[in-house]
């Protein structure tokens, strides 16, 4: 049997829309082993009641992708999923499922495929690399397409605490994409290029105070924030409490803040959301340098 930990991820990091993602230090767990049955799937944890236990399970779909790539047929498998990454909250739950299935199946078969091939397959299943790249590789990853090929670079991992505020309502990516305009003003696009330049420079130079502007976004947050009560008030109060920068995680509704120390920031976010009638779970975590490929049968923070 093999066991893999897959980190949660925050994509669209600040102004890095469809380009920059960061792995976080809390995890889903995928275990794969033999079974006397054709297929046996157990699911525990967040959203377990919503996850299929048949061949439509996304982790299993990813597993079959590896078997097919190697000319094999998956038979007599037991799949156990322990989920901490919440569904449809902007923390890469589908990417975690895809990467977990690919890495577990590859390890189960002796690790014949290299990480770049795993990333290609993950991107093929997910449709874009901005969540699957940090889930697979860890750290902060800039990723995108050069024609039909996935390209990526890893940035220095920021030495910060990450405050993750998860509102207690779902926001599916497909729904939140519908609110995005087909076009934005040229001046808005220029401003976003400026801000993402500050984001990258702040990480590379460890000048985290520049994340005050380096986490600002003008491509998607002005529109998606309409679906999240009190979003901009949350941003302002978090900054007043000491956050370097604040942004939506993925397509939302989760909000992340980067800070030297997170407790005061977390309290400010929680209280501000409550003022708008929104309950939010607050998680204090850090960027995760390791991806799923580094966390096979890992003994540490997870249960593998």
Curated annotation (Swiss-Prot):
Pfam families attached to this UniProt entry: GHMP_kinases_C (PF08544), GHMP_kinases_N (PF00288)
Residues reported in the UniProt entry to bind ATP: 86-96
EC number: 2.7.1.39
Keyword Cell wall biogenesis/degradation carried by entry: no
Catalysis: reaction(s): L-homoserine + ATP = O-phospho-L-homoserine + ADP + H(+)
Organism classification: Bacteria, Bacillati, Bacillota, Clostridia, Thermoanaerobacterales
Family, as annotated: Belongs to the GHMP kinase family. Homoserine kinase subfamily.
Protein name: Homoserine kinase
GO BP annotations listed: threonine biosynthetic process
Natural source organism: Carboxydothermus hydrogenoformans (strain ATCC BAA-161 / DSM 6008 / Z-2901)
Task performed by this protein: Catalyzes the ATP-dependent phosphorylation of L-homoserine to L-homoserine phosphate.
NCBIfam families per record: PRK01212.1-4, thrB
Pathway(s) of this molecule: Amino-acid biosynthesis; L-threonine biosynthesis; L-threonine from L-aspartate: step 4/5
Keywords noted in UniProt: Amino-acid biosynthesis, ATP-binding, Cytoplasm, Kinase, Nucleotide-binding, Threonine biosynthesis, Transferase
Gene of this entry: thrB
Keyword Cell membrane found: no
Enzyme class: transferase
HAMAP family cross-referenced by the UniProt entry: Homoser_kinase (MF_00384)
GO molecular function per UniProt: ATP binding; homoserine kinase activity
InterPro entries: GHMP_kinase_C_dom, GHMP_kinase_C_sf, GHMP_kinase_N_dom, GHMP_knse_ATP-bd_CS, Homoserine_kinase, Ribosomal_Su5_D2-typ_SF, Ribsml_uS5_D2-typ_fold_subgr
Places the protein is found: Cytoplasm
Taxonomic superkingdom: Bacteria
Gene Ontology CC: cytoplasm
């Amino acid at each position: 049997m093999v066991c893999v930990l897959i980190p949660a991820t925050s994509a669209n990091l600040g102004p890095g829309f469809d380009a920059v993602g960061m792995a976080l230090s809390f995890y889903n767990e995928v275990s794969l082993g033999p079974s006397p049955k054709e297929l046996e799937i157990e699911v525990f944890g967040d959203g377990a009641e919503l996850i299929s236990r048949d061949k439509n399970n996304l982790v299993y779909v990813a597993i079959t992708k590896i078997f097919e790539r190697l000319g094999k047929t998956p038979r007599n498998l037991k799949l156990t999923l322990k989920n901490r990454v919440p569904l449809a909250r902007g923390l890469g739950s589908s990417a975690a499922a895809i990467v977990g299935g690919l890495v577990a199946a590859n390890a189960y078969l002796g690790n014949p495929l290299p990480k770049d091939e795993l990333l290609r397959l993950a991107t093929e299943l997910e449709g874009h690399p901005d969540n699957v790249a940090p889930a697979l590789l860890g750290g902060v990853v800039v990723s995108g397409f050069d024609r039909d090929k996935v390209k990526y670079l890893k940035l220095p991992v920021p030495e910060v605490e990450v405050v993750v505020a998860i509102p207690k309502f779902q926001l599916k990516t497909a729904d939140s994409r519908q609110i995005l305009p087909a076009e934005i003003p040229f001046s808005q696009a220029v401003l976003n290029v400026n801000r993402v330049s500050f984001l990258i420079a702040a990480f590379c130079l460890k000048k985290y105070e520049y994340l005050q502007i380096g986490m600002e976004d003008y491509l998607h947050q002005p529109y998606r924030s309409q679906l999240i009560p009190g979003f901009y008030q949350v941003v302002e109060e978090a900054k007043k409490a000491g956050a370097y920068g604040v942004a939506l995680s993925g397509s939302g509704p989760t909000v992340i803040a980067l800070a030297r120390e997170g407790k005061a920031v977390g309290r400010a976010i929680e209280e501000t959301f409550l003022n708008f009638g929104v309950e939010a779970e607050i998680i204090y975590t850090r960027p995760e340098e390791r991806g799923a490929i580094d966390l096979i049968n890992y003994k540490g923070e997870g249960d593998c």
